[in-house]
């Protein structure tokens, strides 16, 4: 009985009939109905009434609905925050200086502010350092000029700074500047010298230190007050070592400059040792050159120009130029400046500096040629050999009578004077 029954069951499985198909479809239909019921429960827009009644007892009501979508919120703040996601509005801006970020939510702003407030954050340190550097640069650009300059003068102070480090630079003012314009340049430097605060640049501090090192003789302070009434009170501590260079354009009203020249030649001999005759030689970077370039002299050589400038002849006094010539000579055999008016002073200084040029009767003309600042003009005494040849031509016996008469040598000297 069991075998037949199993055989029938096996045959039914191999060849299924229509009622068997219907019986197999019934559980499948039941699964589909359960899935549709589950979908209706999960669907937010159409929940089942029984499920909604069970959830209302646990959740708060959501009266605030978004007008742009189907979402509802418990509080008004949540609704407004959600609406900003649709509009793109970002009302919460970062208040930290230098940061321009904006956020739509306040919690995002507080989370962002921790970047600036946290000292351990690398990003916050970088942003803070960049902001401090920007503020420091702005203070330097905006805050320094009122401290360094008096009212109404914005442009002059950069000029003395650039002239201090470059003696022969072209940044100087025109060489015919009157004394009143020179005082406008000198007064801001005195203001920089006395405003020893945090606003003064490092260049000004270094310049004042160099000035203090180069000041060797204290009597210049009284002489400076005597020679410079325009800016004597402001410049007596930093400009005391220049009594004669700047007194070229001030010397018409001050003719008693003998002791100042003595002090100048005695004290500044060590400070100006590295500047013999050439304009390109090195010299200490002090504000001395601002006086030279701003005085009415040409710009190429500060010391050797007064001999060749026609504007300085009425301003110079008797003992002014020889003292500068003695200063510039020091160890040389040829004078750096041509003799100006008196001849006794030249002989007096040639005894101390160049005793070899005295025995010649034509030494004045030769020194005038030798004292030219150009090297090519300084080599003009080479025609001494043609001078001997001219004497040989004038004399009958050649070199035996070459030193016979002083007229031939004076003729040769006059020829050299005519060449000038």
Swiss-Prot record:
One of its GO terms (cellular component) is cytoplasm. It is found in: Nucleus. Involved in carbon catabolite repression. Represses the transcription of a number of genes by binding to a GC-rich region in their promoter. Keywords: DNA-binding, Metal-binding, Nucleus, Repeat, Repressor, Transcription, Transcription regulation, Zinc, Zinc-finger. One of its GO terms (molecular function) is zinc ion binding. InterPro entries: creA/MIG_C2H2-ZnF, Znf_C2H2_sf, Znf_C2H2_type. Residues 127-152, 276-290, 398-414 have a biased composition (Low complexity). Residues 1-31, 97-152, 212-319, 346-420 are annotated as: Disordered. Gene3D superfamilies: Classic Zinc Finger (3.30.160.60). Belongs to the creA/MIG C2H2-type zinc-finger protein family. Residues 1-15, 346-360 have a biased composition (Polar residues). This is DNA-binding protein creA. The gene is CREA. It comes from the Eukaryota. Residues 20-31, 254-264 have a biased composition (Basic and acidic residues). A zinc finger (C2H2-type) spans 64-86, 92-116. GO terms for biological process: carbon catabolite repression of transcription from RNA polymerase II promoter by glucose.
